[in-house]
From Swiss-Prot:
Residues 1-21 form the signal peptide. In testis, expressed and secreted by Sertoli cells, appearing on the surface of testicular and ejaculate spermatozoa. Expressed in the spermatogonia and the earliest preleptotene spermatocytes. In the epididymis, is expressed and secreted by epithelial cells and covers the surface of epididymal spermatozoa and ciliated epithelial cells (at protein level). Expressed specifically in epididymis and testis. Isoform 2 is expressed only in the epididymis. Weak expression is detected in myoid cells as well as spermatogenic cells. Might be used as a target for male contraception. Monomer. Homodimer. Homomultimers. Interacts with SEMG1 (via 164-283 AA). Interacts with LTF. Found in a complex with LTF, CLU, EPPIN and SEMG1. Serine protease inhibitor that plays an essential role in male reproduction and fertility. Modulates the hydrolysis of SEMG1 by KLK3/PSA (a serine protease), provides antimicrobial protection for spermatozoa in the ejaculate coagulum, and binds SEMG1 thereby inhibiting sperm motility. InterPro entries: Elafin-like_sf, Kunitz_BPTI, Kunitz_BPTI_sf, Prtase_inh_Kunz-CS, Serpin_venom_toxin, WAP_dom. This is Eppin. Residues 117-133 are annotated as: Interaction with LTF. Residues 26-73 form the WAP domain. The BPTI/Kunitz inhibitor domain is required for elastase inhibitory activity. BPTI/Kunitz inhibitor and WAP domains are involved in the protein antibacterial activity. GO terms for biological process: defense response to bacterium; negative regulation of calcium ion import; negative regulation of flagellated sperm motility; negative regulation of peptidase activity. SMART domains: KU (SM00131), WAP (SM00217). Residues 77-127 form the BPTI/Kunitz inhibitor domain.
Amino acid sequence: MGSSGLLSLLVLFVLLANVQGPGLTDWLFPRRCPKIREECEFQERDVCTKDRQCQDNKKCCVFSCGKKCLDLKQDVCEMPKETGPCLAYFLHWWYDKKDNTCSMFVYGGCQGNNNNFQSKANCLNTCKNKRFP
């Protein structure tokens, strides 16, 4: 197959990606887990150990002091504050995009979302230097 054959194949993949949606492009160009250094006061319980344990094509990534299912198309720093339905009392931090700062909140200990950090330093390290439109 010459260079024109490869070019035709590439054009076909691009067209299929536009028609089929993100599934094909994710297969061709998989997204990677974020690499963020964090200092953890304690190791959190892992939600997953492998990608197949995550729903909705999320990836199992080391994030915020434990393994969690992340939607790599969604920025955790843009998620709202969620305390979760449980009644524990953990002082955690979340990133408020509107104010461009990390604020303390009471996390109930379960569920919620991934905009949830053990320390202000971890929150700032993950979210502060991002450029938002």
